Amino acid sequence: MSRINLVTTEQANEQQLVLFSAIEQQIGIVPNFLKVFANSPAALQAFLGLHSIASEGDLDTKTKERIALGLAEQNACQYCVSAHTALGKGAGLSGEEILANRAGSSQD
């Protein structure tokens, strides 16, 4: 089976390093899925632009994570569920709330 590899910091070219630096400044790390996107800097830049647009608006972080948890579960994306569980906990969601969000409901 073909596999798309991660772009590591050691392998990254100048353009990729600039993008990695911007990601690290925003969220503290470069998640593996973004290291895969870095195989195409244009795709990574487009994703970051979309993420920036989605981050704007009036919804608070908890609400955004509640929505992301429900979508991740519906998409059957275990990577996304794991990531948004951690982000949800960081935003102050309880374990019970996270389970409710994954089931498409909320205690709030």
PLM ranges: what are they?
Residues 1-108:
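Hydrophobic alpha-helical segments
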